[in-house]
Amino acid sequence: YNLGFYKEKQDSVDTDSVKITQVFVPVTSFIHTLQVDLNNRKYISYDDAQNQKYFEHNYLGTDSIDKTKRTSIKNTIGIALQEGFNKWAKAGLTAFLSYEYRNFALTDTTNIPGQRIINNYKESSLSIGGELSKKQGKLLHYNILGELAIAGEDAGQFSVEGRGDLNLRLFGDTVRLDVNAFIKNQNPVFYFRHFQSKHYWWDNNDLSKIMRTRLEGKLSLNRWGTQLRAGVENIKNYTYLANASIPVKDSEGNVTGFKNNAAVRQYSGNIQIFTAMLQQKLKVGIFHLDGEVAYQKSSEQDILPLPELSAYGNLYMKFGLAKKVLQIEMGADVRYFSKYYAPDYSPVIGQFYNQNPDDKIEIGAFPIVNVYANLHLKRTRFFIMMYHVNARSEER
């Protein structure tokens, strides 16, 4: 809901006449938002013999269905002083208050074999925040947003985010400089603190808040299709999922396999991440080339593994036929990243986790080439692609 005033605006109709209209100028806005999230996840596994062989734990016995639910209701009220209602209001200012209620339903066991109950974990969080922003004009824009949790499960959690862009005309082109930064002190998500399922189970009540600080800059040259980005980030108390599988040995002590398990880990030190990226788009007639090269470095590769070098290229033709009624785009793209210990995937929780240190596999340093054709005829689109054409025929 907006409060403001009307002012007169003059528009020239003819050389000898002027039209005067009333234009509403908002000064103050009252804000209310309601966000309701309902999430369900069901893990189904009927092969109990395989489960007993593959997993270290089977907490729910022979149950084939494992379910978890999450409900979140968030109310936010605020008041905003609008930007530009007079010549002194160079920026907009907003203050808000948020309350969030969360409920997590997890399956639990009892002392009676085969009996299951639902454990409900209820959390709430009350936070205050503010925003300062400048959206009008062509030269400079910025936005600063801060929020602090003052009560509830997340008390003490805070975040301050800022972004801005400066647009300059240089040699007939627009040069844009973007700067983004944030500092966040956040509570680990609920499922890192508590989780109960058929194969994984943990309660971590001693996890510290995660402190993240990031600074990033981006330079864009519109005419040349060039974009250069670089950023640094520091993470303290990085919290992650790890593959905690245990080895299975034969009578002679040789490892014959692993019993799968997962666990939450928290690294109490600092992890630094540096990222630099170059994006370039070229066009000559109907031929297009889009390229991207990125370099990133993690100070703790065992904790937060990243490929140092990754690249993407897309070479294609784009043209129209039949008076441009049929639009055609066809070409090939290639993806590449250097070798690194990529995370494993766990279907039990639908998440990636760090590889088991006793059974690590390094992947990468091999390009993946795809060819494709994309045809657009009025309201109908046809798309065909052959994936990884450079693989050997028996591996496709």
Which residues does each predicted region cover?
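Exposed, low-structure sequence patches enriched in small/polar residues
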Residues: 2-49, 55-56, 60-396
